[in-house]
Amino acid sequence: MFVYTTIMLLLLAEINHSQGCSGLCKINESPQTNIDYRICGDQITQKYTELCGNPAAGRRNRITGLDQRSIFESNLLAKRFLISRRQIVNNRRTDIVEECCAEGCKAEEVKEYCI
């Protein structure tokens, strides 16, 4: 019985491998799809910056000559932005770490997280 089970598992593994992609694959999706890379930790930050740019670059000392009213309006805009971002994040089923580190990802999937 053990030999039969082992042979069946090997055949199933070969069928799954031959149906899908070559190289790195997402195994949690049906059908299996190719991935560009599997990255974790600082590599995710580096790839995000490479594909999305640095969102903090060039923003320093950008706001000058503000009066009290424009500061208040900026505060409201910031709160609206944070609320909208929170809703987007809460609606996502996965985050970038799960997507790229655990499953592997494509460049297009990283770009979905760009602000």
Swiss-Prot record:
One Pfam short name: Insulin
The name this protein goes by in its record: Insulin-like peptide IlO1_i1
Cleaved propeptide residues: 59-93
Main location: secreted
Similarity section: Belongs to the insulin family.
Subcellular location: Secreted
Expression across tissues: Expressed in tentacles.
Organismal lineage: Eukaryota, Metazoa, Cnidaria, Anthozoa, Hexacorallia
Miscellaneous section: Negative results: the truncated synthetic analog (dimer of 27-58 and 94-115) does not bind to insulin receptor subunit B (INSR, HIR-B) and insulin-like growth factor 1 receptor (IGF1R). The truncated synthetic analog shows very weak inhibitory activity against mammalian potassium, sodium, and calcium voltage-gated channels (rKv1.2/KCNA2, hKv1.3/KCNA3, rKv2.1/KCNB1, hKv3.1/KCNC1, rKv4.2/KCND2, hKv7.2/hKv7.3 (KCNQ2/KCNQ3), hKv10.1/KCNH1/EAG1, hKv11.1/KCNH2/ERG1 and Shaker IR, rNav1.2/SCN2A, rNav1.3/SCN3A, rNav1.4/SCN4A, hNav1.5/SCN5A, rNav1.6/SCN8A, hNav1.7/SCN9A, BgNaV, hCav3.1/CACNA1G).
Annotated InterPro entries: Insulin-like (IPR016179), Insulin-like_sf (IPR036438), Insulin-rel_pep (IPR016724), Insulin_CS (IPR022353), Insulin_family (IPR022352)
Disulfide bonds: 40-101, 52-114, 100-105
Function recorded in the entry: Heterodimer with unknown function. Surprisingly, the truncated synthetic analog (dimer of 27-58 and 94-115) does not bind to long insulin receptor (HIR-B) and insulin-like growth factor 1 receptor. This truncated synthetic analog shows very weak inhibitory activity on different voltage-gated channels.
Gene3D superfamilies for the chain: Insulin-like
GO CC, any one term: extracellular region
Stretch forming the signal peptide: 1-20
SUPFAM superfamilies: Insulin-like
GO molecular function, one term: hormone activity
Keywords: Disulfide bond, Ion channel impairing toxin, Secreted, Signal, Toxin
UniProt comment concerning the protein's domains: The truncated synthetic analog (dimer of 27-58 and 94-115) does not display the characteristic helical content of insulin and is largely disorded.
